[in-house]
Amino acid sequence: MKHSVHFGAGNIGRGFIGEILFKNGFHIDFVDVNNQIIHALNEKGKYEIEIAQKGQSRIEVTNVAGINSKEHPEQVIEAIQKTDIITTAIGPNILPFIAELLAKGIEARRVAGNTQALDVMACENMIGGSQFLYQEVKKYLSPEGLTFADNYIGFPNAAVDRIVPAQSHEDSLFVVVEPFNEWVVETKRLKNPDLRLEDVHYEEDLEPFIERKLFSVNSGHATSAYIGAHYGAKTILEALQNPNIKSRIESVLAEIRSLLIAKWNFDKKELENYHKVIIERFENPFIVDEVSRVARTPIRKLGYNERFIRPIRELKELSLSYKNLLKTVGYAFDYRDVNDEESIRLGELLAIQSVKDVVIQVTGLDDQELIEQIVEYI
């Protein structure tokens, strides 16, 4: 049986990446620091995924195990030494924390003489995630390890898309996911092109697909959350049931469409249909997606290369409209949740500094005209 190592045994790891790896005949070693999840994986060796749609079908994922990377790093290194593929779904901010362990696993492959080509795919909500991870891993590799990695270890970027809401069940491994899923991998950085996963799309140039996803799904989802929160909605579905909010989301997506068409020459009709499907996904009545989950970490989401500021910058450069995105940024700056550290921190910054200084600090912008435009909406 083929073997995989997946970093991140959370809902997305189990409910998306794990499902695809299982369907492709892999044994999956889930690596995490959550003892409860790791214990359950080892005790049961399987878990169930429910597809949130009419009929609510279930998939049983088997041949799984768990490794606690904090308590047993040597087991992770051993797993990396023999594995056929490595994936992650841990969040962009956590990638640097697994770099040293990955490097040790790569060194172990080198010492063992394992020259089977291996690809490491960071399945995260970020542009260039796998290459970012590689830059972190390189910091811990020996000169020999660097040469070995350049020859045998690929870090192809990936774009992933599936809504997996925050949830709690008596069975800690059980996870509910939406029917839609998309996983796209760039081919030019593959070291093992013969290992092709079914239900995964492979593209020579991934950037258009990553931007289509991040600027459409992530921007649209976050727009639903921040405007929804402003109007008191508790779930994304509740937000979409407000015609005013839905209209604003559609206006944001229209601006995103104009950027994607101008930049990547996407077909207008196909992109309109893609955005229509996104709205339908947000309106899935079988998914309970809390506004608080989607809106969390607003400081990160207001970053220079993130889902709002980057498309706004690029639309401005192209002299295209971005008024509705600006309005959403205003709602994001106003978002507060006592359980979200970043939203509280944002409020504290706005209380002690000028709005302009906070905008510069959070967004990283130096375009004075754009900074002033954002300030007007806060």
From Swiss-Prot:
Phylogenetic lineage: Bacteria, Bacillati, Bacillota, Bacilli, Lactobacillales
Database matches in InterPro entries: 6-PGluconate_DH-like_C_sf, 6PGD_dom2, Mannitol_1_phos_5_DH, Mannitol_DH, Mannitol_DH_C, Mannitol_DH_CS, Mannitol_DH_N, NAD(P)-bd_dom_sf
Binding site residues for NAD(+): 4-15
Originating gene: mtlD
Name listed for the protein in its UniProt record: Mannitol-1-phosphate 5-dehydrogenase
Entry EC number(s): 1.1.1.17
Pfam families named in the record: Mannitol_dh, Mannitol_dh_C
EC class of the enzyme, as a word: oxidoreductase
Superkingdom of origin organism: Bacteria
Similarity remark: Belongs to the mannitol dehydrogenase family.
